[in-house]
Amino acid sequence: AQAPGITEAQVKRPFNASSGTRLFQWLARAGLEEAEFRRRYYMTAVTKCYPGKHPKGKGDRKPTGAEQKLCRPFLEREIELVRPRAILAVGGLAIETVLGRKVRLEEAVGQAFEVDGRLVLPLPHPSGASLWLNRPENQACLARALGILKEELLPLIEA
């Protein structure tokens, strides 16, 4: 995720609000139930503080480049300490950060990447503010990604 939302910042639990409901519905399609996922896997965000509402009122504001740069050492240290075999990158900013380059969601979601010896699986952000999933071809990208999660990622991380 790019940053905690207001609810997540208050309760200190990632994907705690409506975006979380949608994300965990997706993960359930791949065989991962929310309670088990939260118990077994580490969740973090590119930035660590709630960035505030988007000026146009559609969701939360994207963290600035300066905010991302300030938080980058913390994210890198988290990855160093956790040493994940795989990373589920949720949302455009998380995907861009983990892959180290800009990439269109249509080109990333539904594909697996290898970065620093880790399997990276991009997912779109589950925010209701995102219109990306309104297109049937993008729903197909998400379905492919969830298939990769079930068939490739889960066996890898549970080995």
Give the role of each language-model region.
Residues 2-158:
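A polyanion-binding, active-site-adjacent surface
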